[in-house]
Amino acid sequence: LIGHTQPRRIAARSVASRVAEELGTPLGALVGYQVRFEDQSDANTLIKLMTDGILLAETQNDRYLERYDTIIVDEAHERSLNIDFLLGYLKTLLPRRPDLKVIITSATIDLERFSKHFDDAPIVEVSGRTFPVETWYRPLILEQDEEGNRVEDDLTVDQAILATLDEIAAYERSERRSPGDVLVFLPGEREIRDAADMLRKAQLKHTEILPLYARLSPAEQQRIFQSHPGRRVVLATNVAETSLTVPGIRYVIDSGTARISRYSYRAKVQRLPIEAISQASANQRKGRCGRVEPGICIRLYSEEDFNGRPAFTDPEILRTNLAAV
């Protein structure tokens, strides 16, 4: 049995569906998945997609993971608590299970550090087919005079998204191109709902507005895979950063922020503040376009801001209260 972990339920479902489609087999037979409250696998399943939490739970009853001969840990760069615990567990398990094959995959992983951690494990680089992606910087801070005083008020993120969509439409007219789909990264559900309301009120012609976040029902999530004659604007959290590839995206609008779980020592509670993302996350977002044709990534912050950001996001284990773990 091949076990393949994903950090989110939405990704486990969509990857299982794609692998089953590639192999020409019904989902739930040779290829299945298991997430919380849902198990679409059986005794004949040979490839099992699951969240990393499900595999961790299985270690309670099967300490040596004897059901599996191969474990694939995907999106390892996210360094969530579950992923770090899983990687630590597998490292201690390998001397006891030398026959177990462990594959760690990621697009923006720190290769040397991970390889060294697993006793200089071999590194295999798989280059996907990508097209060139141009980067535009459109910071929210508007004009300043020579003394540094603002001539105009700063834009809100919603206003900047609308202005950027207008700029994209003008660019397409000048280049005589058909409307392309746009993926907009926002920090959370509330920001997505606010932006969706604003865009619907703007009554953009031949444009479909689609929200995308982890708590959406599977039926709602499937809407992003359906074609649309005009332009689709997908408003997504960082669930679309790595876990899900939205097809046909030509433009990415990156707000540069995400909700990042962090423990407050002062308040003694776990919080979800909106913070600036790392360079690795920004590059992941940029990579969402340029899959099927040349793309453009529009960042709603300056190039200086990007260059000053940390290379990687802090591992969750460094920003979480471990007392309850």
Ranges and model annotations:
Residues 1-325:
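P-loop NTPase motor module signature
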